[in-house]
Amino acid sequence: MAEDEIVVEEEQSQPQEITPVPPSSSSSPSLVVEDDDEMKLKHLEFIQVAAVYFAACFSTLYELAKDNAGPLKLGVENIEDCVRTVLAPLYEKFHDVPFKLLLFVDRKVDDVFFDVETYVPSLVKQASSQALTVATEVQRTGVVDTTKSIARSVRDKYEPAAEYYAATLWRLLNQLPLFPEVAHLVIPTAFYWSEKYNDAVRYVGDRDYFGAEYLPMIPIEKISDILEQDQCRAD
């Protein structure tokens, strides 16, 4: 009996083998999601989207031009094969470098935002948000009137200088051969459409349309005076 008890005790004292439990399938998707989040752009994703859109447009235009190349299409395809053979190894090696650089800059932007959130006091943030709210609630009429006054002052200041340089340029062009003959044919049409343009500007100005104050008028009368003076000098 003693021997049997010793054998039983030895069997119980032997360490049990622990079989490793394979990771459940539910844990692997979380790792994949984390990897995907690490490879996503947070702030500069619009640059990636614009690059993809530009590449798609360029590829479409290139294929359209190649299809319409006619007899040159075969030569273009041969050049494509040569370029593909030379640049394929470089592309395989460096094709992800631009995205990694963009990802690096994106993470730096994220770090800057984190630092700002850390060091800027909450009162300053609150004041900034209140200032933004007040700015968005400013009456449109006040802003438009201010902009109108600025535009009017700029126009009154630079319009005489523009007229002077335009007159000087006109006199220089009149010295060119055949220019006066061509000008006499073109000027009536130009005056007609200039008058139509001025009528349109007056129309939108009388109805107080937004932006009408910024549209300049063509000084047809002053241009006519310059032409008459030049004609009198020529005679």
UniProtKB/Swiss-Prot annotation:
Pfam families the UniProt entry points to: REF
BP terms from Gene Ontology: developmental vegetative growth; lipid droplet organization; positive regulation of growth; positive regulation of response to water deprivation
GO cellular-component term (any): lipid droplet
UniProt superkingdom: Eukaryota
Family named by the database record: Belongs to the REF/SRPP family.
Region described as Disordered: spans on this chain: 1-32
The name this protein goes by in its record: REF/SRPP-like protein At2g47780
Start-end of Acidic residues biased regions: 1-12
